[in-house]
Amino acid sequence: MSTPLRSTPLVAPGHTRPITHLSFSPIQDDSSFLLVSSCKDGNPMLREWTGDWIGTFLGHKGAVWSTKLSLDGSRAASGSADFTAKVWDTYSGNCLHSFPHNHIVRSVALSPQATHLLTGGQEKKIRIFDLNRPDAEPEYLFDSGLLSHDGTIKSVVWVGDHTGVTAGDDGKVKWWDLRSRELTKTIAYSDPITSMELSLPTQRLVVTSGKNVEFIPALPHSGHNTHSLTLRYAPSSASIHPILQDRFVTGSMSDEWVRVHSINGEERDVLKGHHGPVHCVEFSPDGEMYASGSEDGTIRLWQTTPGKTYGLWQGTSTNGH
């Protein structure tokens, strides 16, 4: 019986401190896509789908906790411990806007047309900035009093044209109508939310809280059901295969491994290579690989199907995807 091929990761170097967040763009018109990484070194990095470095966004004065790309890949937004959120031109690397906050910005999200920016962090307040009127005061989303959450906001995502979803240390996931600025739904968990990411192709939110992974319909009235799993460890981050939806990957703060699970929770693989806890994982939009970011300061790219010619594995494929 032949031994299954093991995934040999590609290591994307360049950062000097722990990786805090990873985010891929959607697949672009030329079939490529981009990867952006956040790091405590304060310098978000942009990479091609192969992992090759394109450039570094220079300007933050503190750790960067979140960086996300616009749908067309032309803009990036970042949130930092320097109390700012910034918007960048991904072609030139120039900072287009810098928005001051009163505390650490933990998460950012751009609207589908990259006309607005959603931010959240340790102020426990959700702000909406109009990028066409960058000097205008932001609008706020408040639940009770002058706060959006009762704890640090760990993640914000923009769903469709008019929905914002936020998650925090208070264990709550909240849906907001961004036209009326009203709260429309809340789900409460017993543990703080450690991560929440939007899987754009599947239109699901992947949420980690305690030892639980939740796959939640991004829009509450879509007719899809929530799929809930309890693992034997507490994941720091999780990401679902964007096409097959038959598996998900996780990182954990309790060890240095990346794990692959079937959608029913069965552990399929344990991938070793990092030299520190794994803070974040993310599937590429074509499902052919997933990226992991660690306390060790490296990004590792893992093949979904080891042995397949893809990207820089076994030479560059002629058609890429």
Question: Which ranges hold each PLM region?
Answer:
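Conserved blade-ending motifs and adjacent loop-strand segments that build the rim/top face
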Residues: 230-236, 267-280
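Conserved strand-to-loop turn within each blade of WD40 beta-propeller repeats
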Residues: 38-41, 78-82, 120-123, 167-170, ...
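Per-blade loop-tip surfaces of WD-repeat and WD-like beta-propellers in eukaryotic adaptors/scaffolds
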Residues: 2-8, 30-32, 46-63, 87-105, ...
